UniProtKB/Swiss-Prot annotation:
One of its GO terms (molecular function) is 5S rRNA binding. SUPFAM superfamilies: Ribosomal protein L25-like. Keywords: Ribonucleoprotein, Ribosomal protein, RNA-binding, rRNA-binding. The keyword RNA-binding applies. It comes from Janthinobacterium sp. (strain Marseille). This is Large ribosomal subunit protein bL25. InterPro entries: Rbsml_bL25/Gln-tRNA_synth_N (IPR020056), Ribosomal_bL25/Gln-tRNA_synth (IPR011035), Ribosomal_bL25_b-dom (IPR020057), Ribosomal_bL25_C (IPR037121), Ribosomal_bL25_long (IPR001021), Ribosomal_bL25_short (IPR020055), Ribosomal_L25_dom (IPR029751), Ribosomal_uL5_bac-type (IPR020930).
Amino acid sequence: MKVIAFARKELGTGASRRQRIAGLTPGIVYGGTAAPVNISLDHNALYHALKKEAFHSSILDLEVDGKVEQVLLRDFQVHAYKQLVLHADFQRVDAKQKIHVKVPLHFVNAETSPAVKLHGGIISHVASELDITCLPSDLPEFVEVDLANLDVGHSIHLADIKLPKGVAAVIHGGEDNPTIATASVPAGKVEAEADAAAAAAASAAAAAPAGDKK
């Protein structure tokens, strides 16, 4: 994905305000051996790009005054209640150095899993993204989580996920194999099934004497 930007000379709160009035978003690109560069981006183009999932987890081609560098979107700020992007930070990447980034998890085959198809269960997503490390060329837009074999009372853990080649998960909090998704039967459904079973047992018990008289 390509991002067009321009180097900006004026800095400070007043300059940033004037840029936003002019339809531009101030930003910065940093990292690597080059000095940080303050930039301006077209606000509307950036606003719509930020709505795309891939924009947050892909290597971007950032063109600043005709010079193209590969970067990652590292941070952005938006207005509390206006549809306004206030600032964006981009980090340069080196093709030979591994990067550390969060990528979204895509859950597939929930409808055909035993938990849902056979038991009418609910699958809860414990995590929605995954911290990974890899070379820029190996960066996936997302990591797929296959729920096809998930049954009620069981979980999907990190070890159950097949990571793309060259990609390693970054573990936090000392947990070696964190839970990614769980499957359970809704409480109301469990109670309804228990009531139905009790009613069936009562009916069978009531019918038993009549059957014995035959």
